[in-house]
Each structure stands twice: as structure tokens, then as C-alpha cells.
Amino acid sequence: MTNTQNSKSIWTITPIMVITAIFCCVLWGSASPAIKIAYEVFKIDASDTASRLMLAGARFMLAGVMTVVFGSLISKKALIPQKSSWKYIAILSLFQTIGQYYFFFMSLANTSGVKGSIINASGNFFAPMFAIFLFRLEKPSVKKLIGCALGFAGIIMFFGGMGAITSGAPITFKGEGAMLCAAFFYAVSGCCIKIFSKYENPVILSGYQFALGGAVLFVIGLLSGGNLIFYSSGCYLNLIYMGFISAGAYTLWGVLLKYNPVSKVSVLGFVNPIMGVVLSALFLGEGQEAFSVLSLISLLLVSLGIVIVNYRKLEK
């Protein structure tokens, strides 16, 4: 893509880029309340792991189909992976969909949407740490270390400090601990995408890994005795929306990254946890927890950390 081509694209217009990025963050932020609402409309109990896996699987199979269709329409050609890419798709699905969302769906059955949104933001700080020290994809910098430190400080503060965390009182593995595991898998998958996208279109990787990972989760849930019963039209609408969350956000975000400097787009990711907290307050009735002084300070530190980690001066 040449600079001349970039300059002609509407996606390079700053207001459009910002609005689209924020829309993506609204979609991602709505995932926590959407999943908790899904448990209600599908009548899935917190202890029903098998049915929960079927719900997650159905969501991501649908998201995979949507992503490939949306991507094909934008590219004006069918997005089909190369034979050599299936190993990348399989590895990516293991981390980005199977691992991450096994724990993500577990967590939201056992904790609040507000807590889930703030803890899940830790993936933004695990990712650069893994990229620097584990995968050697980036060089360490004071700026990134400061950003990660601020972000983790915000998450620790949310639970009342290290003393409260080490006492074990505010954290359960099935709730907050599971969301931390989900963030871990998210960070690893982000590093995998950076590596694998050298060999395959990232939209193809995302779409097909969603579908593959979703199918695996669905089959595991089905074989484990789960049920996914559509009690009303609300069940269909909820599932379609959850599929669109991933497909719409990943597709649009990918388009923005294609036409703009990465840092100009990724720095707006700070909106994601904010939307998660706000939407949990609006749709789940968690306003008291969301707008407490402790939550707001924690959210400020987390968001500031994301900005610092991703901010880079743009070349003139």
C-alpha cells in the first residue's frame, strides 16, 4: 500500500479513524455484559461448564464466519488460507480462542462485569512483557516498563493492594483468577499474531482460528453433556451480537491498522476497559462498584498505562 493510496482512503481521516477505533472498543467493552446477559437468557448456571463451552463455541464459530465474510467483502475476494497456514491457525486458535475464552467465560460466570473488565486489561501489559522477554519481538524501553507498572498498579489497587491480594480474600480462581488466565492467553496470542502475520493475512488468521477454536469448544461442551437451548428470540439476538463483537471489531481494527500507523490506532485501546466498566454499570446494574473512588482511580491507572505502553511519536 503506497502513501498515495493511503492518502485517498477515508480510514486515514483522523475523526473517522478515532470514531471507528472507539466503536471497536465499545464492541470489545460490551463483551462482558453481553456474556453475563447470555447466561441469563440461555439459563446457564454458573456451575454448568459444558453448556458454557457450547455457548462460547457457538459464538466463535459464528464470529469466524462473519470475519471471513466481512474480510472477503472488504478485500473484494474470497479469503482462503494457504495450506501452509493451517498450522498457524491451529496454534493461534489454541491460545486466542480455546484457552482465552475457556477462562473468560468461566470468569464471567463467577465475578462481576466491572471486575472482569479491569482485570482483563492486564493482557495489555502482559503482551509487551512477553514480546520483550519471551518472544524477543521488541526491545525493552523505560516507557513500556513504566506503562506496565502503572497498569498493574491499577489492577492491584482495585483489589485493595498487595496485602489484600496475598490474603486471598478478594480473589477466587474461578472468578478473578480465571480472567487473569484469559489475559495471559490473550497476550500470548497477540505475540503469535505478530509472528504469523508475516506469512498470512491477519484477517484470514483471525477468522479461521475463531471458527476452528469455536468448533473445538462447542464439541467439548457437547460431549461433556452440555445443552444450548434457544428459549426466545432474545437468545438468537444475543448470540448474533456476541459473534459480531469479535468479527466487527477485529475486521475494522485490522482495516485501521492497514491504513494508519500502528501507534496512532493502538493508543486508543485505553477506551476498551473504560467501556467495559461503563457498559457493565449500565446493563448489569453494577454502578456502585463501577463508579466507586477505588474503581475510578484503578481504571485511570490502567488506561494511562495502556496509553504509555502504546504511545509513539509519529514521524513527520
Spans of model-derived segments:
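Transmembrane alpha-helical segments that form core, pore/gating elements
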Residues: 25, 36, 67-68, 127-129, ...
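Specific transmembrane alpha-helical segments of multi-pass solute transporters/efflux pumps
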Residues: 72-116, 120, 157, 242-260
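Helix-helix packing/entry segments at the starts of transmembrane helices
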Residues: 58, 97, 115-122, 193-215, ...
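Hydrophobic transmembrane alpha-helices of multi-pass small-molecule transport proteins
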Residues: 67, 129-130, 142-162, 270, ...
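Transmembrane alpha-helices of multi-pass small-molecule transport proteins
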Residues: 41, 45-96, 126-130, 185-189, ...
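Specific alpha-helical transmembrane segments that line the substrate/conduction pathway
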Residues: 54-57, 61, 65, 105-139, ...
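Glycine-/small-residue-enriched transmembrane alpha-helix faces in small-molecule transporters
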Residues: 2-54, 168-195, 238-239, 244, ...
